[in-house]
Amino acid sequence: MLQTTSTLEEPKYDSLQSLPLALQIGIQYGGGGEGRVIAELHKFLPAAGFRVLGAVAEPDDIAASTRGEFLAFAPTSASKLDRFRGARRKLGRILEVDRPAIVASHFSLYSLPIYDKISSSRLVTHFHGPWGAESAQDGASVLAASARMLVEKSLYRRSARVIVLSQAFAKLATERYGVKPDRIRIVPGSADIDRFAVGVTQRYARERLGLPLDRPILLSVRRLVRRMGLLELITALKQIAARVPEILLCIAGRGLLRQELEQRALDLGLSQNVQFLGFVDDDDLPYLYRAADINVVPTQALEGFGLVAAESLAAGVPAMVTQVGGLPEVVAGLSRNLMFASPRAEDLAAGLTDVLLGRLELPSNLECAAYARENFSSPLMANRIAAVYREIL
């Protein structure tokens, strides 16, 4: 039976050093969905009863910014083999010297170098998404995608617990990877509520970022890859602009699809309606959400949670999402009007046009912010994850 965690009362400890240690292993600290979870656990797990150390592939200077509590495997310029060796050396030393009570893997490849050193009884996998399937969607060869899936399966099946972000990913872990349901725990993701609840007006946010004050703005914060649905969103914008000519779509993020997206906008005559922002600094991201009228999450495939939807709600801005993966689980409790009928361009256009013309009502800024604080705070996520960790101590 699949279980959603409840928050248990945390044990009391006299000092941080007396807490059981949870070693976190991942790709990145602070960037992307997985990296943000790692950073939030580093910040909030101690209050939930676990000391945290970790090792990641990037950034290079992570040791300096975390007081040595996180290490980089190797310089980001290093070869994959050198990163692999660095992971084995540094993780192996932490296992030997610090003896963590929990080994928490956020990415199967970088846990592979220490498979022979990890006891299955203390291994927890944080399942952020199907690496092999995502790489296939992004253009990897069948052989490469299959090899990645084998690495994933070997880790997930060894794990004492597998933490997933949604009911959709719980089903995927069981059906695709053969994880036993009684080992799966559902812990929704989180947003740093206080960081995104900037408490400024939309006008102030737009002035700060140099965005127009007199146009309705749609925002989409995405990696620029095909499954994120940006081609469909730009196609939908053609229909929206026919009814709301002053509409502006701001796309934030980087990726290999940038040139194709720009060409699609040009071909559809939307050069004045689409603005590509590229990478947006973490300090500016809360203001970017606040500047928008609607945050659009048009995912076409493989979305476990949808962190950008939770972040947007925390900023007080409604997020309209496709009914893909775990996205409906993020917004359904707030309003079903936040879900598109389908991921197709025509349904994206219909839903957004109805809102912009006042035919469909979305939750208010205050309702969005209150819902995010109640359901997606980082301390709440940390307490739920700590409860899972304690199950296997």
Which residues are covered by each model-predicted region?
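A short helix/loop element that forms part of the nucleotide-sugar donor recognition site in Leloir-type
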Residues: E9, A197-L211, L366
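Short His-centered aromatic/hydrophobic patch
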Residues: S105-Y110, F127-H128
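Membrane-proximal helix-turn-helix segments that form the acceptor-binding/catalytic region
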Residues: L143-V164
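Carbohydrate-associated surface elements
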Residues: A168, S190
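Conserved donor-binding/catalytic core segment of Leloir-type glycosyltransferases
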Residues: P212-M228, I234-L237
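Short alpha-helical donor nucleotide-sugar binding micro-motif in glycosyltransferases
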Residues: F279-V280, Y287-A292
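Short hydrophobic beta-strand element within catalytic cores of glycosyltransferases
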Residues: P318-V321
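Conserved acidic donor-binding segment of nucleotide-sugar-dependent glycosyltransferases
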Residues: G333-E346, D354-L360
